[in-house]
Curated annotation (Swiss-Prot):
Assembly: Component of the lipopolysaccharide transport and assembly complex. Interacts with LptE and LptA.
Name of the protein this chain belongs to: LPS-assembly protein LptD
S-S bonds: C31-C724, C173-C725
InterPro entries: LipoPS_assembly_LptD, LptD, LptD_C, OstA-like_N
Gene for this chain: lptD
Entry keywords, A to Z: Cell outer membrane, Disulfide bond, Membrane, Signal
Any one cellular-component term (Gene Ontology): cell outer membrane
Length: 784
């Protein structure tokens, strides 16, 4: 009887298309109460080698051809059990066959079960030689997992490789509920290829068929297969009704693609979203090409543009070849500056202000590495399109440590800057930076003494337009040589907190750094790639005030700071606080008249920063940070958040973030000049929450309020209903989507999304709790 068991199990698995990804742990446990479990001891070993036990009221036979068992027939072998009113065993000699053909007929109240499936039906048949099996009018139920259904005839063929269902059905709903089901006139499951082919496929809600396809191919199991994924729909004020129907294409073992027709009612067309992934000897990468043939909204808003085609191309690649070659690509380009305002896309956002196009090839061996790269920017502002690209850039590093007590390094860079505008300055910059370090350390402290030379040469061209409009002139050839000296010392003190908190340990970590860089007037050098760096606590100990090499500020300063940490008895950090400052003995200058605070001639304690983290309990956490810069005359940035987190789906967070307009202007001068919504800085208070609100109902939401503008900045609300066989999600989002220069106010987009997930049939394609929170324009960040 065991010969027919794989048939039944394969049939169940073949049609199940089962996925548990969407089930939360508590819901899964509730659903498991509604499915049968295997209550007999599991038997190990090859089933064909195990004994067969047959119990029946009556038995008769005509050896060796036939045997008949009747009356409460109970046959057991290993973990398998077959019960029926009557079981007939037949054995016949076949012409040309070395062994006789052995078949089994089971009649009346046929019941089969093992540790994976239960089958009930009036009649069954099996060929024990070929393992071909037929089961008529069978009902099946998986054991220990959801999945059940029935078929007029279930057949097993090809040494258990193929399962064929005639008029078969499947649902993952618990017994007594047929909310949805999938039926087909014929279903063929190829276990080896892990694919199910369905003819005359009908999807039914209750007894009502709502979808039909003459042929459908669906992946089964973990093996990647081509086929349609679950569709999605939403409504937005930007595009009105939107519908997605993704198709997954398994091209080869090392490459695949997802092709998604995306219909947008207001745009009057279908955008084709094409994602391609690959893996090669040179690395792994992803390409995305989105294309909208025409856009009637864009035509109305931009009547002077020659084309209304909208597109995006994204390419990300990272790889190592032959252990020494490194290849990296980070490339994003769109058809027009309004693209990310009009279309949601995971590869860019309207708040970024620009898109990066970077290619790099690197070579690295012991003590040496070199990288050749090109970097361009596509600025989204229609008012200021000026941006510099590095075409190309060469970076070289050579290290030689343990030269006596010293570590040495030589860094070199050569780069050519090109502007998108023909009238802006351009330059070739060559930089050389030799460094020597003397590191000393023991168990409780360290001190590092460093000396370096910063030598830079500029060859600037195309200066006429700039020099004719500015009192400070740029020179064609500029040399800048600056020595730098730094001493950085750290200590770590530790004590047990037995009196206050037994088992806890506190550390005290003071740090002091002296930095000296002489002043060099850099007003004759145009600023190609420098901007003010953020001064959080760790940033206080940087060598540079500005990123890039065009502005290197003079320094005669001492940075001091202290960090204290508290660890519990499991060495988990429960609390830390850091406070530091920079004390300037002389003014930090570059000679650039465009940097307003250099005219104030300020010295003393100018920059303060502090960070803290407190893990109050396993469920409560608090983080915060503040940076005060007297050069900007105020608090530059600050942030804080407090969170209660019970698990992934139960959390509440309150947060606040602030950035002064002076800080934004100093760190992002080009973006600040066009980003009208940030002219008054950023001051936003927010709340994020996710929580089950009733039996099988849960809610997720986020709300941010701009205290400067006294209006909502962003909000999102999602509601989900989950059952054992389906889930429904409805989401609403209102987000900032640009600035109207004519009316001088922010533009918002409202979106309503709707998604259905079928438990046991679909993958988790819709928005889950974490996905919804992180898809927000102000994404959720964990405080714990």
């Amino acid at each position: 009887m065991k010969k027919r068991i794989p048939t039944l199990l394969a049939t169940m698995i073949a049609t199940a298309l089962y996925s548990q990804q969407g089930l939360a742990a508590d819901l899964a446990s509730q659903c498991m109460l509604g499915v049968p479990s295997y209550d007999r001891p599991l038997v190990q070993g090859d089933t064909n080698d195990l004994p067969v036990t047959i119990n029946a009221d009556h038995a008769k036979g005509d050896y060796p051809d036939d045997a008949v068992f009747t009356g409460s027939v109970d046959i057991m072998q290993g973990n398998s059990r077959l019960q029926a009113d009557e079981v007939q065993l037949h054995q016949k000699e076949a012409p040309g066959q070395p062994e006789p053909v052995r078949t089994v007929d089971a009649l009346g109240n046929v019941h089969y079960d093992d540790n994976q499936v239960i089958l009930k039906g009036p009649k069954g048949w099996a060929n024990l030689n070929t393992k071909d099996t037929n089961v008529w009018e069978g009902d099946y139920q998986m054991v220990g997992r959801q999945g059940r259904g029935k078929a007029d005839l279930m057949k097993q063929r090809g040494e258990n490789r193929y399962t064929i269902l005639d008029n078969g059905s499947f649902t993952s709903c618990l017994p007594g509920s047929d909310t949805w089901s999938v039926v087909g006139s014929e279903i063929i499951h190829d276990r080896e290829e892990q694919v199910a082919e369905i003819w005359n496929a009908r999807f039914k809600v209750g007894p009502v068929p709502i979808f039909y396809s003459p042929y459908l191919q669906l992946p089964v199991g973990d093996k990647r297969r081509s086929g349609f994924l679950i569709p999605n729909a939403k409504y937005t004020t930007t595009n009105y009704f939107e519908f997605y129907l993704p198709y997954y294409w398994n091209i080869a073992p090392n490459m695949d693609a997802t092709i998604t027709p995306h219909y947008m009612h207001r745009r009057g067309n279908i955008m084709w979203e094409n994602e391609f992934r690959y893996l090669s000897q040179a690395g792994a990468g992803l390409m995305e090409l989105d294309y909208l043939p025409s856009d009637k909204v864009y035509e109305d808003e931009h009547p002077n543009d020659d084309s209304s085609r909208r597109w995006l191309f994204y390419w990300q690649h990272s790889g190592v070849m032959d252990q020494v070659w490194r290849f990296n690509v980070d490339y994003t380009k769109v058809s027009d500056p309004s693209y990310f305002n009009d279309f949601d896309n995971k590869y860019g956002s309207s708040t970024d202000g620009y898109a990066t196009q970077k290619f790099s090839v690197g070579y690295a061996v012991q003590n040496f590495n070199a990288t050749v790269s090109t970097k361009q920017f596509q600025v989204f502002s229609e008012q200021n399109t000026s941006s510099y690209s590095a075409e190309p850039q060469l970076d070289v590093n050579y290290y030689q440590n343990d030269v006596g007590p010293f570590d040495t390094r030589i860094y070199g860079q050569a780069v050519h800057f090109v502007n998108t505008r023909d009238d802006m300055p351009e330059a070739t910059r060559v930089h050389l930076e030799p460094t020597i370090n003397l590191p000393l350390s023991n168990n409780w402290g360290s001190i590092n003494t460093e000396a370096k030379l910063l030598a830079t040469h500029y060859q600037q061209t195309n200066l006429d337009w700039y020099n004719s409009r500015n009192t400070t002139k740029l020179d064609e050839s500029v040399n800048r040589v600056m020595p730098q000296f730094k001493v950085d010392g750290k200590m770590v003190f530790e004590r047990d907190m037995e009196m206050l908190a037994p088992g806890y340990t506190q550390t005290l970590e003071p740090r002091a750094q002296y930095l000296y860089v002489p002043y060099r007037d850099q007003s004759d050098i145009y600023n190609y790639d420098s901007s003010l760096l953020q001064s959080d606590y760790s940033g206080l100990f940087r060598d540079r005030t500005y990123g890039g090499l065009d502005r290197i500020a003079s320094a005669n300063q001492v940075t001091t700071g202290v960090t204290s940490r508290i660890y519990d008895d499991a060495a988990v950090e429960r609390f830390n606080i850091s406070v530091g400052q920079i004390y300037y003995f002389t003014e930090s200058r570059t000679g650039d008249d465009n940097i307003t605070w250099e005219n104030d001639d300020k010295t003393g304690s100018l920059v303060w920063a502090g960070d803290t983290y407190w893990r109050i309990s396993e469920r409560w956490g608090l983080r915060g940070g503040i940076q005060y810069d007297t050069r900007l005359d105020n608090v530059a940035t600050s942030n804080s958040s407090i969170e209660y987190r019970r698990d992934e789906d139960r959390l509440v967070q309150l947060n606040y973030r602030y950035a002064s307009p002076e800080y934004i202007q100093a760190t992002l001068p080009k973006y600040y000049s066009t980003a009208e919504q940030y002219k008054n800085g950023i001051s936003q208070v927010g709340a994020v929450a996710s929580w089950p609100i009733a039996d099988r109902w849960s809610i997720v939401g986020a709300y941010y309020y701009d205290t400067n503008a006294n209006k909502q900045a962003d909000s999102m609300l999602g509601v989900q209903y989950s059952s054992c066989c389906y889930a429904i999600r409805v989401g609403y989002e209102r987000k900032l989507n640009g600035w109207d220069n004519d009316k001088q106010h922010a533009v918002y987009d409202n979106a309503i999304g709707f998604n259905i997930e079928l438990r046991g049939l679909s993958s988790n394609y819709g928005l889950g709790t974490q996905e919804m929170l992180r898809s927000n324009i102000l994404p959720y960040q964990n405080t714990l």
